[in-house]
A protein has these predicted regions:
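Short beta-strand/loop motifs in extracellular/secreted proteins, especially
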Residues: 12-14, 55-57, 93-95
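An acidic intrinsically disordered interaction segment
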Residues: 38-53, 252-271, 329-334, 383-387
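Active-site-surrounding "flap" and adjacent substrate/cofactor-binding loops of secreted or lumenal enzymes
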Residues: 2-23, 109, 203-220, 321, ...
Length: 388
């Protein structure tokens, strides 16, 4: 079964139907199992090759987390591209592929609130949507919790169909598309989180809304741009792999390819009221702390190499908090709040020195700020915060 990073169910299913036979290729289903033959991990994509007696299915997930394009990086859309071929020298029989995304993708847990189904159609795609009937944006923070506001989209390229699927009291989106021999079909998952974070009392929109975009508008772009985006992702992955192999060998390269999406996706991107970048991390099962300095420091080499402006976006919340009257100490905070609410530390309200890590966090802040200054060849950021 598919799940959230906390281990709680978030149901995605994939069904491949040939005649009356149904095969499951994604998530837990009642269909016949397909045999997994190959897995390939690249920086922005993971590709699976599966087989049934009648066909070979190639399934590729792509999240285009390219740091040289912040609008694309922030776009909350993941592609699922599927291709089928006949086996044993026989042509592919008539067949259909279906993806299902259920209400657990927009709730903390199944049945938490009633959900509302909708549809969106645009040039190049059709999408089904699910959203909680209770929309309390940024209503809570925590660790073992999942977003229960906003709206999830499951989209399929033009020629496909979307519909509401109901099983008992649970609702889901189902997207279907007929397959032809060797011809790729494209699906996409998207999420509108409405607001990204609360930043010292102010709700901030996600970066992808910077140009007044909507998810339907982004889906139109995403489907139209897929061939070039997929090409860019592959080129970047090949470059990263070659550079990593040159300095650390095959095993090191494999680790970097495996880690890329995990490291980058652990953040949300937005801007503060002054238009400065914020790149906010969330700790996993460690109080859910946001903008944690001892997360920023070890992850910074990736961003120093590929987009040092994002390192400044990681540091800004800590400097902002440390310079405010709310921070009583003469050393660096460990974090700026509990994701997605960056309103100051939640443990002891940031007032108990026993909860702090002054040597570690001051060292982390000094070294990371110095490294970003060198990477950008610019003293402006460091000079702005020199009094600290």
């Amino acid at each position: 079964p598919t799940c959230h990073w906390t281990g709680k169910p978030q149901v995605l299913q994939g069904i491949f139907q040939v005649g009356r036979r149904k095969y499951g290729f994604l998530g837990a289903t009642d269909a016949l199992p397909m045999q997994l033959r190959q897995v390939t991990v690249e920086a922005c994509s993971t590709t699976y090759v599966l087989e049934s007696p009648e066909a070979r299915l190639t399934l590729q997930f792509t999240s285009p987390l390219l740091l040289d394009d912040l609008q694309l990086l922030a776009r909350p859309i993941t592609y699922i591209a599927i291709t089928a071929q006949g086996r044993h020298g026989r042509p592919l029989p008539p067949c259909t592929v279906s993806l299902v995304a259920d209400e657990t993708l927009c709730l903390d847990h199944a049945g938490q609130y009633p959900v509302e189904y909708g549809e969106a159609v645009g040039p190049g795609f059709a999408a089904g949507t699910l959203a909680s009937g209770v929309q309390e944006v940024l209503n809570r923070s925590g660790d073992d919790v999942r977003i229960d506001w906003g709206k999830v989209y499951l989209a399929v390229e033009t020629g496909g169909r979307v519909a509401l699927k109901e099983e008992g009291e649970q609702c889901a989106i189902q997207a279907d598309r007929e397959l032809q021999e060797g011809k790729q079909v494209l699906f996409a998952l998207a999420y509108d989180e409405v607001e990204a974070i609360q930043y010292f009392g102010k709700n901030l929109p996600p970066y992808w809304k910077k140009e007044r975009q909507t998810i339907p508008g982004l889906l139109e772009l995403a489907f139209a741009q897929y061939p070039s985006i997929a090409q860019r992702c592959q080129a970047f992955s090949q470059d990263l792999q070659a550079r990593a192999q040159a300095v650390g060998g095959d095993a090191y390269a494999e680790l970097l390819l495996l880690a890329w999406r995990q490291v980058v996706a652990a953040h949300t991107l937005c801007e503060d009221e002054a238009g400065e970048l914020l790149f906010i991390s969330k700790e996993c099962f460690s109080n859910g702390c946001a903008a944690t300095v001892d997360i920023t420091y070890p992850s910074s080499p990736l961003f120093l190499l590929y987009q040092p402006e994002l390192v400044l976006g990681m540091l800004r919340p800590i400097f902002c908090y440390a310079q405010s009257p709310a921070w009583p100490f003469a050393f660096a905070p460990h974090d700026a709040g509990q994701f997605p609410l960056l309103n100051g530390q939640v443990y002891s309200g940031g007032t108990d020195p026993a909860d702090q890590m002054p040597v570690e966090e001051c060292g982390n802040m000094l070294l990371t700020t110095a490294a970003a200054t060198v990477a950008l060849d610019d003293l402006t950021f460091a000079n702005t915060h020199w009094d600290l």
